[in-house]
């Protein structure tokens, strides 16, 4: 459960906070820079890319204008390269928890008289912004957890959904459960430090890169690690601290017991609206209803773009999200600079911008 952010935590002041660093969020950052807006990005994941990076990095994408075809991860890499000249701060492992209006008299220096928003995250960060652009895809991602009732008490100690510190597994018997790239990558990596690593998957086939699967099978054949086909059946503990000692595995032939002190379950991610669902926004089936002239939500200064935005005839396409973000930021500009008119200038005719983009 996230801890409360102290009211005295430092506050970062910027024009726009972008929630979500997937393709739409990254393009939004680029557009913010083009418009002359300062922005910062937050994402609950530990790196940029959203679903494209975490769920299907090798999925081919064919419907991006002027890009006949590319892999999902390649698209993310290109978007990162595109917005790099603006060098916007990105804060990973941060989930937006709450948003509150800052009364005009209490607004930060330089913005007195204009209502702004204070966004807090579960990681202790606070942002004073003119606008929030939510590009969180289908919502915040969370790991798919082990469904066994005894797993909850072991989470963070002996049951893990990510590898934060490899040294924690040194000299221990480790089971890595899952059949995707992350599961195989970490099983191969941990075999170098653990006493023994067993990869556990419900079937012989994998949802991973062919080269990674081949490397895993070679490591198993040469006795560097083990592979078991089966599913988690029970977690057994021992000792005063109730540490994990064995894992019961259901197999085709019945069951078997594997010694284990650590379990790394990498079953993929599931999406959930998260705290944004409590932000007093008009929502439809977990998505944010927006005005299609500005992509602003029912709450002033909060915008949505990408899969999380809802409106009639909405198309869940990355290119649609690009369009939505571009229009949202033009309205956000007026909140950031209410005294200034936004004059449209083609990037090719803006000498300063052209210099930044071509000589970054």
UniProtKB/Swiss-Prot annotation:
SUPFAM superfamilies: FAD/NAD(P)-binding domain. It catalyses: 2 reduced [2Fe-2S]-[ferredoxin] + NADP(+) + H(+) = 2 oxidized [2Fe-2S]-[ferredoxin] + NADPH. InterPro entries: FAD/NAD-bd_sf, FAD/NAD-binding_dom, Fd--NADP_Rdtase_type_2, Ferredoxin-NADP_redctase_2. Keywords: FAD, Flavoprotein, NADP, Oxidoreductase. One of its GO terms (molecular function) is flavin adenine dinucleotide binding. FAD binds at residues 43, 51, 56, 96, 141, 307, 348. It holds the Pfam family Pyr_redox_2. Binds 1 FAD per subunit. Its EC number is 1.18.1.2. Its cofactor is FAD. PANTHER family: THIOREDOXIN REDUCTASE 1-RELATED-RELATED (PTHR48105). Homodimer. This is Ferredoxin--NADP reductase 1. It comes from Cupriavidus taiwanensis (strain DSM 17343 / BCRC 17206 / CCUG 44338 / CIP 107171 / LMG 19424 / R1) (Ralstonia taiwanensis (strain LMG 19424)).
């Amino acid at each position: 459960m996230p801890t409360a952010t102290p009211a005295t935590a430092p506050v970062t002041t910027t024009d726009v906070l972008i929630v979500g660093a997937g393709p739409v969020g990254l393009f939004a950052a680029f557009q913010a820079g083009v418009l002359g807006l300062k922005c910062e990005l937050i994402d609950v994941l530990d790196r940029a890319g959203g679903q494209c990076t975490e769920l299907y990095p090798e999925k081919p994408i064919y419907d991006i204008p002027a890009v006949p075809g590319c892999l999902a991860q390649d698209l993310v890499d290109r978007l990162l390269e595109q917005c790099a000249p603006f060098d916007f701060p990105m804060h990973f492992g941060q989930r937006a928890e709450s948003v509150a209006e800052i009364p005009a008299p209490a607004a930060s220096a330089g913005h007195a008289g204009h209502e702004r928003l204070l966004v807090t995250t579960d990681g202790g960060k606070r942002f004073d912004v003119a606008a929030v652009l939510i590009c969180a895809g289908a919502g915040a991602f969370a790991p798919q957890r082990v469904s066994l009732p005894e797993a909850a008490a072991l989470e963070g100690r002996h049951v893990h959904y990510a590898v934060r510190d490899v040294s924690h597994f040194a000299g221990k018997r480790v089971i890595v459960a899952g059949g995707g790239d992350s599961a195989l990558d970490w099983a191969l990596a941990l075999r170098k430090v653990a006493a023994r690593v067993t990869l556990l998957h419900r079937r012989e086939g994998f949802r991973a890169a062919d080269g990674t699967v081949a490397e895993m099978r070679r490591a198993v054949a040469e006795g560097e690690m083990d592979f078991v086909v089966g599913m988690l059946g029970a977690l057994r503990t021992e000792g005063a601290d109730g540490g994990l000692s064995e894992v019961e595995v259901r197999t085709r032939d019945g069951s078997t017991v594997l010694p284990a002190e650590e379990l790394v379950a990498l079953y993929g991610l599931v999406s959930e609206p998260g705290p944004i669902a409590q932000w007093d926004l008009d929502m439809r089936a977990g998505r944010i209803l927006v005005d299609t002239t500005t992509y602003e939500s029912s709450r002033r200064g909060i915008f949505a773009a990408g899969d999380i935005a809802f409106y009639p005839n909405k198309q869940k396409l990355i290119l649609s999200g690009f369009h939505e973000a571009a229009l949202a930021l033009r309205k956000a500009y007026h909140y950031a600079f209410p005294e200034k008119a936004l004059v449209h200038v083609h990037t090719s005719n803006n000498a300063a911008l052209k210099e930044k983009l071509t000589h970054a």
